[in-house]
């Protein structure tokens, strides 16, 4: 089965642009929905963003992949998001990435469409391999010119379903269906040493019947729809902001800087991050949990709080200390430049550094306070720290008497006792093992984010004039979506140990966060209010440009690239 008229079907549908404005509700939902059939090369599938699909896609006719499915692909790929004055800020943010200006980096036009060839002697197909630069350029081309020209440029006139597969790969995605991948791998050979275009004359250009079943073709078309929608929801890098000097100049002129921080800002203090090879989740694999994240699962906590309190001492933050990076943010506040610091950390070190509560949003809560899960009595978090260090369940004094009745043999505060003592026959079935247990006010999986996050972000994304993401891999939604909420003309800077490949930062400074903060302060002529500043201000830093807008920062203390 060949697909000679697919481009015509897609192009014809693309001519009928969506003229009505996308409603705030539709657009906000679109931002938060996530594709389930494809995963990004650099990001888990549950973190993806996609535009909502029209009903026609949900009931695709699998017996006619050349008819309704082609039209549906064109319909979704050609959707345009147009902001209006009364749109929700979250809706405007997604719509704004579609608009283009002179500040946007213009992509290169490829030399020709994707080439797939077939060896007539053995029937094996030869597919292309793509470089990181080619993938980035393709995504930029789609954003800059739209789906119509993108498909017309990257696909040949006559094509089969394998072209759809390779177009998905070119955009930086991988098909998740293992059965489909197995079929493709059995008929395709990727020559890693030479490009398909350079292979000998024994390889003929593909114009034979489709090697995949109709159902598999439909699956690929759906995946391409999702890939296109994901790309259309992300921003393009700015053409006039890609050097350290650009960053320094912007820091001097910016007045409303939005700072998003993650675990990397605290690792210099000995606090582990969560997802690295040496992070917290790696250290607790020995507990035998199906998923290490279960220690922060709210439902599990309510049924057995000892799961969390067995390891809580490992994430308990040190008191009254903070890093030079925390003080760098405090410096921005002192200069009247800090709009807000959104932190994913639960250690509350920002407050120790002096960042005011009105400038701080603890997206995932913190150890600053604790609350009884039964009567909701609230107290300062430091009052349960000793219990946590001693592997004891912190219990509410107001619920203690009742807990003793429900758990006559296991009412005490030893970790694990409540989960193993006191049978269900001795208490009502609705009384959980967490009765009367104090829980730190950190946001567990299954809990809603604090109201302050939702209230603040709606205003801040429209007011900020610079976004700086520090020490975060941006893998936890909805905080990770902030980079796509901010208007496209606002410069975005990453300061992190490792690159974040699923976001389009204008400038990435890779290295130790404290070092980079000190280097930036030196170049700005500023003083970081931290006890280590006397050493940091005289430190020598080297910046090595790895790619356009990507620099590796090293020092005498940390000479190795990361």
Swiss-Prot record:
Its activity is increased by calorie restriction, which slows the pace of aging and increases maximum lifespan. Activated by resveratrol (3,5,4'-trihydroxy-trans-stilbene), which is found in red wine. It is found in: Nucleus, Nucleolus. Residues 237-527 form the Deacetylase sirtuin-type domain. Residues 1-67 are annotated as: Disordered. Keywords: Chromatin regulator, DNA damage, DNA repair, Metal-binding, NAD, Nucleus, Repressor, Transcription, Transcription regulation, Transferase, Zinc. This is NAD-dependent histone deacetylase SIR2. The active site is at 364 (proton acceptor). InterPro entries: DHS-like_NAD/FAD-binding_dom (IPR029035), NAD-dep_histone_deAcase_SIR2_N (IPR007654), NAD-dep_sirtuin_deacylases (IPR050134), Sirtuin (IPR003000), Sirtuin_cat_small_dom_sf (IPR026591), Ssirtuin_cat_dom (IPR026590). NAD-dependent deacetylase, which participates in a wide range of cellular events including chromosome silencing, chromosome segregation, DNA recombination and the determination of life span. Involved in transcriptional repression of the silent mating-type loci HML and HMR and telomeric silencing via its association with SIR3 and SIR4. Plays a central role in ribosomal DNA (rDNA) silencing via its association with the RENT complex, preventing hyperrecombination, and repressing transcription from foreign promoters, which contributes to extending life span. Residues 26-36 have a biased composition (Basic and acidic residues). Homomultimer. Forms a complex with SIR3 and SIR4. Component of the RENT complex, at least composed of SIR2, CDC14 and NET1. The RENT complex interacts with FOB1. Interacts with ESC8. Interacts with and ZDS2. Interacts with MCM10. Interacts with SLX5. Interacts with NSI1. GO terms for molecular function: DNA replication origin binding; histone deacetylase activity, NAD-dependent; histone H3K14 deacetylase activity, NAD-dependent; histone H3K9 deacetylase activity, NAD-dependent; histone H4K16 deacetylase activity, NAD-dependent; metal ion binding; NAD+ binding. Its stability is directly linked to life span, which is extended when it is present in high dosage. Conversely, its absence shortens life span. The reported ADP-ribosyltransferase activity of sirtuins is likely some inefficient side reaction of the deacetylase activity and may not be physiologically relevant. Binds 1 zinc ion per subunit. It comes from Saccharomyces cerevisiae (strain ATCC 204508 / S288c). One of its GO terms (cellular component) is heterochromatin. Pfam families: DUF592, SIR2. Belongs to the sirtuin family. Class I subfamily. The keyword Mitochondrion does not apply. Its cofactor is Zn(2+). Residues 11-25 have a biased composition (Polar residues).
């Amino acid at each position: 089965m060949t697909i000679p008229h697919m481009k015509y079907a897609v192009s014809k549908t693309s001519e009928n642009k969506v003229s009505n404005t996308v409603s705030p509700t539709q657009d906000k939902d679109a931002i938060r929905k996530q594709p389930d059939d494809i995963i990004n090369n650099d990001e888990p599938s549950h973190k993806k963003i996609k535009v909502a699909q029209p009903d026609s896609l949900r009931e695709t006719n699998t017996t006619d992949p050349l008819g309704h499915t082609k039209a549906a692909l064109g319909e979704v790929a050609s959707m345009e998001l147009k902001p209006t004055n009364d749109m929700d800020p979250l809706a405007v943010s997604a719509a704004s990435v579609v608009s283009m200006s002179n500040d946007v980096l213009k992509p290169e036009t490829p030399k020709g469409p994707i080439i797939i060839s077939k060896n007539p002697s053995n029937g094996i197909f030869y597919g292309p391999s793509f470089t990181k630069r080619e993938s980035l350029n393709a995504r930029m081309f789609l954003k800059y010119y739209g789906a119509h020209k993108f498909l017309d440029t990257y696909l040949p006139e006559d094509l089969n379903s394998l072209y759809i597969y390779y177009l998905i790969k070119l955009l930086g995605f991988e098909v998740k269906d293992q059965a489909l991948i197995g079929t493709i791998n059995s008929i395709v050979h990727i020559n890693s040493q030479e490009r398909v275009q350079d292979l000998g004359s024994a390889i003929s250009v593909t114009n034979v019947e489709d090697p995949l079943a109709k159902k598999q073709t439909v699956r690929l078309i759906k995946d391409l729809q999702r890939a296109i929608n994901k790309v259309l929801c992300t921003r393009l890098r700015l053409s006039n902001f890609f050097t350290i000097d650009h960053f320094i100049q912007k820091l001097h002129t910016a007045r409303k800087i939005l700072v998003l921080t993650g675990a990397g800002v605290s690792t210099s203090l000995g606090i582990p991050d969560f997802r690295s090879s040496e992070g917290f989740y790696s250290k607790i694999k020995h507990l035998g949990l199906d998923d290490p994240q279960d220690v922060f699962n709210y439902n599990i906590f309510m049924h057995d709080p000892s799961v969390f309190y067995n390891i809580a001492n490992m994430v308990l933050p040190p008191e009254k200390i903070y890093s030079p990076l925390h003080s760098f943010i405090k410096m921005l506040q002192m200069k009247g430049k800090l709009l807000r610091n959104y932190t994913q950390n639960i250690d509350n070190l920002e407050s120790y550094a002096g960042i005011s509560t009105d400038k701080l949003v603890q997206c995932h809560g913190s150890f600053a306070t604790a609350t009884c899960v039964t009567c909701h009595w609230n107290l300062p978090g430091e009052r349960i720290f000793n219990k946590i260090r001693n592997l004891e369940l912190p219990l509410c004094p107001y619920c203690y008497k009742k807990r003793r009745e429900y758990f006559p043999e296991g009412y005490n505060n030893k970790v694990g006792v409540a989960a193993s003592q006191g049978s269900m026959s001795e208490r009502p079935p609705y009384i959980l093992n967490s009765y009367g247990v104090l829980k730190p006010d950190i946001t567990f999986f299954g809990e809603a984010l604090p109201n302050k996050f939702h209230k603040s972000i709606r205003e801040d994304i429209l007011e900020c004039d610079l976004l700086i993401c520090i020490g975060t891999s941006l893998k936890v939604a909805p905080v990770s979506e902030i980079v796509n909420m901010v208007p496209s003309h606002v410069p975005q800077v990453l300061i992190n140990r490792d690159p974040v490949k699923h976001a389009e930062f204008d400038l990435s400074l890779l290295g130790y966060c404290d070092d980079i903060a000190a280097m930036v302060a030196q170049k700005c002529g500023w003083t970081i209010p931290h006890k280590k500043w006397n050493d940091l201000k005289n430190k020598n830093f080297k910046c090595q440009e790895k790619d356009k807008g990507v620099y590796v920062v090293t020092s005498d203390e940390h000479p190795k690239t990361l």
